[in-house]
Each structure stands twice: as structure tokens, then as C-alpha cells.
């Protein structure tokens, strides 16, 4: 079973050489880390287990995403990357995992870790196995070329999209992922929370709204984050994945570190209507 790319040629380059150049541009951009970590398959002790990464077109959010991938790649190759993304399309189940096979991008194919996935489904009360939710969804797909740039096909993924973004669903998912991390302690498992921040306000308003959400992220206050999103018109699309990361970080004694906060107005667009982007890591 193959999941074909849905947004190659629009969100990122469809030509492999141009795509690699686009990723390198993201790292070297003045909004990015301005450096590219060395490619390494070496096993290292990983401190940063969870990351927040944006998921817009690379020309907009790539430089911000590069901050998270800089830390991820610097700590060596993970065995499994659990990627949590919001469901933008409204298709499929409330919480959906792609069941098996491979995901393709212009840089090659990445296999789904079916063993870890099935254990996660067993531990969880909310995950359905189905493809419909994933066919046109971009929030997971756009993360893969960054991972492939550093690790080729030498890692596996567990792709999960979340339509029902409530604290209760986040608790179920976080508890299941926590149990899987404990069970597979011999595997190097990383979790990515794919999310953009506030949408389509002017730059200054977006930065201010985002800061309210970022304050809750730094406090690992997942219910506070939910209240900010629901009560203060902060149009953060992947708050479900972020809530899962906050719960996991607290369970495992990790702290939130903000790596970069910017908007599309900072990277490549006008500032009258922007989208906010955040890169963050959760470590000691």
C-alpha cells in the first residue's frame, strides 16, 4: 500500500534536486538556523523527544521548520517518527492512522512501522486504521522530505491525523504513545506535532495572538492552550497534536524550549495577512 504525494510541486519542489536545494535554503535562510547539521546515522543519546514543526509551503515555513530539524538531526537518526497532524480536509475518522505500507515523496519512500502502529492502536481507544483521512492531507507529508534529507529511508513513520482536537482525545493519544515509548525502550522514537499558528491576521496581531498560545506551551498547560484557541480566536490549526506533546513532555519530565517564532511576512510575503509558525523542542 503506497501513499502518493499530494502536495509535491505546490508546497515543495517535485524535482528531487530542487527539493534538496529548497531544504538547504530553509536551513541557510536568515530566519532559519543559518547552518545545516551533518548527516549522521550514528546512535546518540537523545534528549529532545518531541518537536513542534510548521507545515506550510516551504517558501513560507521552511526556515522555521529547519530549527526543529536542526536539533532532531543533530542527535542522530531516530528509528521511528510518530507524526501527528491536524485533519484539514474533513475526510475520514476523528483520529486516523495510515495502516501499512509506504509513503512516497520525490526523495523516495518511507515505510510505516506497522508493529509500533498496531501496539499504539491496541493501547488507544480512539485511533482508526484508514486511508481516506490521509489522501489529500498535507500536514504529515511536508515533514517527510526534511527527514529524508538527513536519513534517506533508514527510519520508519507512524502517521496519525487528528480531526477531533479536544483535551480528552489528546489525553487518550498521549497515554497510548507514552505506553508505546516505554514498551519499545530499545527503539529511538521521536514525536512530531505538526501545526501552524494563527492564520490571516496582520503580522503584529498574529505575533500577539501566538504569544498567548506560546505561553501555555512553555507552561506545558494543554488545557490552557485549548482555552486560548477556543476562547480567544487564536486560529492555531494543530492544537490537538501540540496538546499531545505537552502531556507527553510532562509525563517524561521534559521542558519546552522555543526555537523560533515568525510569520509568513518574515519569510516571503506581505505582512497585512500572515500565518504564524513555531519551532519548539521538548528536552531536559
Swiss-Prot record:
This is MEMO1 family protein SSO0066. Belongs to the MEMO1 family. It comes from the Archaea. NCBIfam families: AmmeMemoSam_B. Gene3D superfamilies: LigB-like. InterPro entries: MEMO1_fam. It comes from Saccharolobus solfataricus (strain ATCC 35092 / DSM 1617 / JCM 11322 / P2) (Sulfolobus solfataricus).
Amino acid at each position: 500500500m503506497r501513499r502518493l504525494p499530494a502536495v509535491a510541486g505546490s508546497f515543495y519542489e517535485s524535482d528531487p534536486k530542487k527539493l534538496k536545494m529548497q531544504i538547504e535554503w530553509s536551513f541557510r535562510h536568515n530566519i532559519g538556523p543559518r547552518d545545516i547539521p551533518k548527516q549522521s546515522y550514528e546512535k546518540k543519546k537523545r534528549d529532545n523527544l518531541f518537536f513542534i514543526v510548521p507545515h506550510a509551503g516551504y517558501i513560507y515555513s521552511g526556515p522555521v521548520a529547519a530549527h526543529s530539524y536542526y536539533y532532531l538531526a543533530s542527535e542522530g537518526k531516530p528509528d521511528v517518527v510518530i507524526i501527528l497532524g491536524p485533519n484539514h480536509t474533513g475526510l475520514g475518522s476523528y483520529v486516523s492512522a495510515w495502516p501499512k505500507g509506504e509513503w512516497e515523496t520525490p526523495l523516495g519512500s518511507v515505510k510505516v512501522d506497522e508493529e509500533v502502529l498496531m501496539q499504539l492502536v491496541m493501547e488507544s481507544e480512539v485511533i482508526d486504521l484508514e486511508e481516506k483521512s490521509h489522501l489529500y492531507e498535507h500536514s504529515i507529508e511536508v515533514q517527510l522530505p526534511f527527514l529524508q534529507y538527513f536519513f534517506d529511508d533508514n527510519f520508519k513513520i507512524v502517521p496519525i491525523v487528528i480531526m477531533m482536537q479536544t483535551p480528552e482525545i489528546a489525553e487518550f493519544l498521549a497515554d497510548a504513545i507514552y505506553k508505546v515509548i516505554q514498551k519499545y525502550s530499545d527503539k529511538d522514537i521521536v514525536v512530531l506535532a505538526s501545526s501552524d499558528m494563527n492564520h490571516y491576521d496582520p503580522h503584529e496581531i498574529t505575533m500577539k495572538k501566538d504569544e498567548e498560545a506560546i505561553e501555555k506551551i512553555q507552561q506545558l498547560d494543554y488545557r490552557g492552550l485549548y482555552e486560548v484557541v477556543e476562547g480567544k480566536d487564536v486560529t492555531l490549526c494543530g492544537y490537538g497534536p501540540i496538546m499531545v506533546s505537552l502531556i507527553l513532555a510532562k509525563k517524561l519530565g521534559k521542558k519546552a524550549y522555543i526555537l523560533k517564532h515568525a510569520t509568513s511576512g518574515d519569510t516571503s510575503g506581505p505582512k497585512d495577512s500572515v500565518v504564524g509558525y513555531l519551532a519548539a523542542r521538548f528536552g531536559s
